[in-house]
């Protein structure tokens, strides 16, 4: 009250009104009964075992699928190997046949060159004969 005596008005602190509906009450945590804990543990272990069994089964099935895919791939590669061997064998046969035909192909090339040379000679002979004929006709007219 000394402040009031000095001329400063005394302020009174007002507290906010309490709303009892907004206040939560805490309940004491109770330990579940021993039988409930045992039942929950059994249930948890059972469900965990089911889950792990499912996971292991799925993984096992994945590995079986992968093994089957590897076997099929191996068979496909063996088929491709056989095909490649057959192609190689056929190619060797064709190369041998081509080597056997090579002398005849060389002869054909030589004959083709000779025919071209003979054709050129025939054109020259034809041109020469035309010139000769023109000269003969010219001399005949005189």
Swiss-Prot record:
Q: In which tissues is it expressed?
A: Widely expressed. Highly expressed in most brain regions, spinal cord, kidney and ovary. In the brain, expressed in the frontal cortex and the superior thalamic radiation, with the strongest expression in the granule cells of hippocampal CA1, CA3 and dentate gyrus regions. In the spinal cord, mainly expressed in the gray matter. Expression level is high in laminae I-II and V-VI small sensory neurons in the dorsal horn, as well as in the large motor neurons of the ventral horn.
Any one Gene Ontology cellular component term annotated for this protein: gamma-tubulin complex
Which residue intervals are annotated with compositional bias (Basic and acidic residues) in the record? 11-33
Role, per record: Component of the BLOC-1 complex, a complex that is required for normal biogenesis of lysosome-related organelles (LRO), such as platelet dense granules and melanosomes. In concert with the AP-3 complex, the BLOC-1 complex is required to target membrane protein cargos into vesicles assembled at cell bodies for delivery into neurites and nerve terminals. The BLOC-1 complex, in association with SNARE proteins, is also proposed to be involved in neurite extension. As part of the BORC complex may play a role in lysosomes movement and localization at the cell periphery.
- Which parts form a coiled-coil structure per UniProt? 79-127
Q: Where is this region: Disordered?
A: 1-33
Please describe the quaternary structure of this protein: Component of the biogenesis of lysosome-related organelles complex 1 (BLOC-1) composed of BLOC1S1, BLOC1S2, BLOC1S3, BLOC1S4, BLOC1S5, BLOC1S6, DTNBP1/BLOC1S7 and SNAPIN/BLOC1S8. Octamer composed of one copy each BLOC1S1, BLOC1S2, BLOC1S3, BLOC1S4, BLOC1S5, BLOC1S6, DTNBP1/BLOC1S7 and SNAPIN/BLOC1S8. Interacts directly with BLOC1S1, BLOC1S3, BLOC1S4, BLOC1S5 and SNAPIN. The BLOC-1 complex associates with the AP-3 protein complex and membrane protein cargos. Component of the BLOC-one-related complex (BORC) which is composed of BLOC1S1, BLOC1S2, BORCS5, BORCS6, BORCS7, BORCS8, KXD1 and SNAPIN.
| Keyword line | Acetylation, Coiled coil, Cytoplasm, Cytoskeleton, Lysosome, Membrane
Q: What is its main location?
A: cytoplasm
UniProt source species: Rattus norvegicus
| One family name in Pfam for this protein | BLOC1_2
Q: What is this protein called?
A: Biogenesis of lysosome-related organelles complex-1 subunit 2
User: Where does this one sit in the cell?
Assistant: Cytoplasm, Cytoskeleton, Microtubule organizing center, Centrosome; Lysosome membrane
Q: Which residues carry the post-translational modification N-acetylalanine, per the record?
A: 2
